[in-house]
From Swiss-Prot:
Catalyzes the formation of the alpha-1,6-glucosidic linkages in glycogen by scission of a 1,4-alpha-linked oligosaccharide from growing alpha-1,4-glucan chains and the subsequent attachment of the oligosaccharide to the alpha-1,6 position. The lineage of its organism: Bacteria, Pseudomonadati, Pseudomonadota, Alphaproteobacteria, Hyphomicrobiales. GO terms for cellular component: cytoplasm; cytosol. GO terms for molecular function: 1,4-alpha-glucan branching enzyme activity; cation binding; hydrolase activity, hydrolyzing O-glycosyl compounds. The gene is glgB. PANTHER family: 1,4-ALPHA-GLUCAN-BRANCHING ENZYME. Monomer. This is 1,4-alpha-glucan branching enzyme GlgB.
């Protein structure tokens, strides 16, 4: 019996390929001119026979030189293009060799990536359909500078990490073009860490689509050809424009009869029209980036570039944005650049080291949330985040971003006990690198999208959050006014008889109301974790609770600052928000609840129609106190002013259950003043006490109105031109 031909001795590079530790498989695999021939090497572990088919039909048999599946042969000298023909079991397959194609990243790309200034990472990193040398396929690029080996695994290679090891380029970016991989293919990255340890399969940080949880594979999607939604109306984010935001969790606004989510397209048929009818100028979505845990509400994302697949495809999400803009409603996204979860398929220990996060848990882990904190000192990380912000505005025509948990980013000792944090280089608690990141984020976003806006959820007294970077600020368009929210909710929760002792909680907010461009937020955070619903905080019997709520909402809309209401506030949701259930829309069958909805609709319309109520929301010159000292009667009065000297609106709020008649308020103009809204109207469920639509200012040295002030109510009056 003839003896088997012995395997030839192989170079060290061959064993590096076989053992999955070669950082540049192109250096060995593929076609290489050697000794007057075109040597072809292929690593196909499951193949029994392999041939190379040249561009002119010439065929070269590749010898199996190692039992692991390494094949070597030669085509005639001068051959450049070829295919591989391999036998797998009983099947013979002819296919392109991934290791014969040119690089994906250019030298200029690598320069910008290394510098951390590439503003369009989404054009280069991730998975992109492309054509190289006339062959269609997918180009994959991922950052893993400390990895020993990175492979792409997916539907196109039976999830075999031996089939498609990538090559590393400058600054630790790994790339590979896989011929005939296609849109819709599922994939992940198989990574061996710097010490040779195998990591869990990683989702693509730049994936544009993902599987529905609990599955975690990334999905190839051609985002460059995504139909871009139409733009929002011009000037929708201007400081002088009305801004009334309806904050929505897409998974629980409405649900189907079987408690299933509405899809993006089903939401597009209902939500934008509802927001427009209710008078809101903007919708703000809780984070839509892919996230593994429903209970995080999206605030622990693993896929920052992928709209969550819970509700449909990226095209479906684009259709929702387009529907909003068609209705004249702007779209804001909650954006989470402060932290991320430590799920094994995510960003944590991505290449076997702390690539995206800090290695030291005193810097890299949130004690409150058990999440990981981005390392803003790495240019690759800040580039990843800034590009993500720009991505949402460019690809999906988003009108602005609200940045979550800014305070946790600004302070190194945020929610940490003494000794559990590391000071900055000056010994302070300020996170200098995070400050630089936020300034860069705002600077680059407004440079690219000057009509957009940003808002910061910042709960401390950090100065100049919404002031320009060039003047020492963080550069945000707006800041959430958390102090106003806490003080006023505390005030309104008191029994009216005790409110005179808390009078200053209403007044205090006006001492700083114009230090920032403020949004007044009644957000999702205020209706969870035992805080009760907004209605649930109101004291008194049923009538008083709803009257208090009507007065409070009216006070909010008359107060300087842009407005934000979380879904359910407009129907006086009785219970706390539950992300696993729809809002209680059946409550609208009851007059008090439908009355609140009618009031919010009319407050929005009034806010938009009366320039004095919005044009100078963020300007001290747009506000004047008229009555601040009537604590015994719980009455406040002020004047709102527009840009035109005759644009005025008088707001009077009575936080007591008493009716006050012949109540005197000085005004700037004599003549007729129209009562344009009364929250005590029977239309809203009130007692219908008021001024029969108008009142005349008594002329004198100072014009004066003598008014009937309804109980637990607010009235708005404007001078008749």
């Amino acid at each position: 019996m003839p003896r088997a031909k012995p395997m030839p001795k192989l170079p060290a590079e061959a064993y590096a390929i076989i053992e999955g530790r070669h950082a540049d498989p192109f250096h060995y695999l593929g076609l290489h001119p050697e000794g007057g021939k075109s040597v072809v090497r292929a690593f196909l572990p499951e193949a029994s026979n392999v041939e190379a088919v040249g561009e002119h039909g010439e065929v070269a048999r590749l010898d199996r030189v190692h039992d692991a599946g390494l094949f070597v042969g030669a085509l005639p000298n001068g051959s450049k293009h070829y295919q591989l023909r391999a036998k797998f079991g009983d099947s013979i397959v002819e296919f392109e060799d991934a290791y014969r194609f040119p690089p994906i990243l250019t030298d200029f790309d690598l320069y910008l990536l290394g510098e951390g200034t590439h503003q369009r990472l989404y054009d280069k990193l991730g998975a992109h359909p492309m054509t190289l040398d006339g062959v269609d396929g997918i180009g994959f690029v991922v950052l893993a500078p400390n990895a020993r080996r990175v492979s792409v695994v997916g539907d196109f290679n039976f999830w075999d990490s031996r089939r498609h090891p990538m090559r590393v380029r400058g600054s630790g970016y790994w790339e590979l073009f896989i011929p005939h991989a296609k849109r819709g293919d599922h994939y992940k990255f198989d990574i061996v860490g710097p010490h040779g340890h195998q990591l869990p399969l990683k989702s693509d940080p730049m994936a544009f689509a993902s599987e529905v949880r609990p599955k975690t594979a990334s999905i190839v999607f051609d985002e460059a050809h995504l139909p871009r939604p139409r733009p929002a109306p011009d000037g929708i984010n201007a400081l002088s424009a009305p801004m009334s935001i309806y904050e929505v969790h897409l998974g629980s606004w409405r649900r189907k009869g079987d408690n299933e989510w509405l899809t993006y397209r089903e939401l597009a048929e209902q939500l934008p029209a509802y927001a427009r009818d209710m008078g809101f100028t903007h919708l703000e979505f809780l984070p839509v980036s892919e996230h593994p845990f429903d209970g995080s509400w999206g605030y622990q994302p693993t896929g920052l570039y992928a709209p969550t697949s819970r509700f449909g495809t990226p095209e479906d999400f684009a259709a929702l944005v387009d529907a909003c803009h068609r209705e004249g409603v702007g779209v804001l996204l909650d954006w989470v650049p402060g932290h991320f979860p430590d799920d094994p398929h995510g960003l944590g220990s991505f290449d076997g080291t702390s690539l995206y996060e800090h290695a030291n848990p005193l810097q890299g882990r949130h004690l409150d949330w058990g999440t990981l904190i981005y390392n803003y000192g790495r240019t690759e990380v800040t580039n990843f985040l800034v590009s993500n912000a720009l991505f949402w505005l460019e690809r999906y025509a988003i009108d602005g971003l609200r940045v979550d948990a800014v305070a946790s980013m600004l302070y190194l000792d945020y929610s940490r006990p003494p000794g559990a944090w590391i000071p900055n280089q000056y010994g302070g608690r300020e996170n200098i690198e995070a400050i630089a990141f936020l300034r860069r984020f705002n600077t680059e976003l407004f440079a690219r999208f000057p009509q957009a806006t940003t808002a910061a959820e910042e709960s401390t007294a950090w100065p100049q959050v919404s002031r320009p970077v060039e003047f020492g600020g963080l550069g945000f368009g707006y800041k959430w006014n958390m102090g106003w929210m806490h003080d006023t909710l505390n005030y309104i929760s008191k029994d009216p008889i005790h409110r005179k002792h808390h009078h200053g909680e209403i007044l205090f907010g006006l001492h700083y109301a114009f230090s920032e461009n403020f949004i007044l937020p009644l957000s999702h955070d205020e209706v969870v974790h035992g805080k009760r619903s907004i209605l649930g905080r109101m004291p008194g019997d049923e009538w008083q609770r709803f009257a208090n709520l009507r007065a409070y909402y009216s006070f909010m809309f008359g107060h300087p600052g842009k407005k934000l209401l979380f879904m359910g506030a407009e129907i006086a949701q009785s219970r706390e928000w539950n992300h696993d259930q729809s809002l209680d829309w059946h409550l609208l069958e009851y007059k008090y609840h439908s009355g609140i909805q009618a009031l919010i609709r009319d407050l929005n319309r009034l806010y938009r129609a009366v320039p004095a109520l919005h044009q100078m929301d963020c300007d001290q010159a747009g506000f004047e106190w008229l009555i601040t000292d009537d604590a015994n009667r719980n009455v406040f009065a002020w004047l709102r002013k527009g840009l035109d000297e005759h644009a005025r609106c008088l707001v009077i709020v009575n936080f007591s259950p008493n009716v006050y008649r012949n109540y005197r308020v000085r005004v700037p103009f004599a003549g007729k003043w129209k009562e344009v809204l009364n929250s005590d109207s029977a239309h809203y469920g009130g007692s219908n006490v008021g001024n029969i639509g108008e009142v005349h200012a008594v002329d004198g040295k100072t014009p004066e109105l003598r008014l009937t002030i309804p109980p637990l109510a607010a009235i708005f009056l404007v001078p008749e031109s």
